[in-house]
């Protein structure tokens, strides 16, 4: 039904809004996971390093986080990520070669989610997306919560992204209750 389809924002339309609602000079910041981390480090509460082959920083990271999330720094939507266990490789140089072949350039400490969120799907970090939009300017800008939703992985996959088979459930902005089946 065409009327029903008009109630959804397509990816193309979403990117149009994204470009219009965000300052152009911030796009590079949010397209690069490591730059985002550097800017918002106090809010992360986990370790994240830029991977550039063998380094003392990488060696120290592996001592603290032998199992970690390797990422392509400019990837999105659940692509370009993999949980790696350094102990499963014969050597650190072998791990480095593996990561370089896959263009991984960010290493991130794994997130341990709460027991309540883990009950939804224990293999993934299930997340709540709370997008906000500043809708007015001046001395008292109004910040509006824009369609919050819960992302849940499924079928043992460690990715919760809807584009990778995850389930997306809308959250009512007023009550905070889940209001769709997914």
Regions from the PLM with identified roles:
Residues 1-25:
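ATP-binding N-terminal substructure of ATP-dependent carboxylate-amine bond-forming enzymes
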Residues 16-137:
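Active-site nucleotide/adenylate-binding loops and adjacent lid/helix of ATP-dependent enzymes
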Residues 121, 125-182:
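ATP-dependent carboxylate/phosphate-activation module, predominantly the ATP-grasp catalytic core
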């Amino acid at each position: 039904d065409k009327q029903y389809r008009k109630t959804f924002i397509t990816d193309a339309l979403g990117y149009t809004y994204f470009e219009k609602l965000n300052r152009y000079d911030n796009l590079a910041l949010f397209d690069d996971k490591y730059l985002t981390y550097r800017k918002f480090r106090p809010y992360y509460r986990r370790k994240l390093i830029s991977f550039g082959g063998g380094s003392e920083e990488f060696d120290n990271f592996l001592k603290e986080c032998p199992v970690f999330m390797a990422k392509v720094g400019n990837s999105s939507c659940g692509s370009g990520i993999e949980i790696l266990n350094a102990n499963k490789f014969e050597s650190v140089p072998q791990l480095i070669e593996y990561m370089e072949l896959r263009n991984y350039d960010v290493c991130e400490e794994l997130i341990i989610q709460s027991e309540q969120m883990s009950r939804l799907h224990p293999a993934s970090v299930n997340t709540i997306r709370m997008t906000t939009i500043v809708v007015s300017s001046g001395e008292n800008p109004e910040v509006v919560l824009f369609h919050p939703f819960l992302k849940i992985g499924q079928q043992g996959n460690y990715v919760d992204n809807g584009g990778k088979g995850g389930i997306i459930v809308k959250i009512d902005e007023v009550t905070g209750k889940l209001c769709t089946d997914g």
